[in-house]
Amino acid sequence: MVRKYPQLEVDLSILRSNARQVITRCQQQGIRVCGVVKGVDGLPEVARAMRLCGAEELGTSRLEQVERCRAAGVGGPWLLIRIPGLSELPDVVRLCETSLQSERVTLDALEEECVLQGKTHRVIVMADLGDLREGFWDKDEMVDVCVHVERELPHVELAGVGVNLTCYGSTKPTPEKMQALLAIAARIEKHIGRKLEIVSGGATSSYTLVHWGTMPAGINHLRIGENILLGKDLQVGWGIQDMDYLRMDGFTLRAEVVEVREKPTYPIGEFAIDAFGRKPVYVDRGIRRRAILALGRADVGELESLIPREAGLTVIGGSSDHCIVDVEDCPRRLEVGDIVEFSLCYSHLLYATSRSDITIQFVN
């Protein structure tokens, strides 16, 4: 079955432009970029574009995406950016050159798997500096584990240390956080008697320090995805005004109109909960013209944050497979069969690219 809509258009020329802008600015400050493709379900075309624009390494959180990219000819080095489970280690060693790690038991099991496969594997050991996701909270323990890797795990190479910020705890990357990571790296280097190759200062949110010129010297690696793919987190979410060298229109979502009618805006009857167990609040605006699109929460997650590309359209809600749009004020009189376009946020992109029934079209 060939499905035309919903359709996600990917403008590779915009992604290449964003990648060059980000990677060049990082390189000027001595920082290598790992191009992260988890936000697009590891689309090989996007991974290839990042690689061609200077990403020395590619990263994602899911091994299936690495396998798909390798099968499409997008080789390594690959970095696994989600700390792996013990059950995943055979594929980690088989598919990735490097992984993030935060548990001694996993590192010991990784050594055993490397022996079985006759390979070596590089690791970046993670520090938790307050965001409270992965990483060592006790820094003495972290130093001890890094020394253990260096001296007792011959098939596991201690490539460096890293941190994650913002993703869970919303904690901002600051020069002080980066200095704390550099101090941990220095302690480890003193114990092992050599320089660490990688001090990885975080993801897209840490790019703010590159943009502002406040990234401390010594941070030499960032894991960047959203800022290349969409460029919205920092420009829209953080309100950074002078980052307009990054375009935010690389992805366009198109959906088909399947019903247009004038209807009340306030549901009629006794209220319970909606299909997702919630109790929405409705505003009575009288009778208004509404369109239903063949697109739902199963496709993009939160519908209300979709950004219509057309004036006079407002997403007012929906369900798993339906998106309800107020079109009363739309200059174009929408009819059944018409197509509506949206810009996306990162969460929409995560959903849409992982749906097999959304057609993906690449341009430029």
Predicted regions and their residues:
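Conserved, mostly hydrophobic/aromatic
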Residues: 15, 38, 69, 125, ...
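Short secondary-structure boundary/capping segments within folded domains
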Residues: 24-27, 58, 281-285
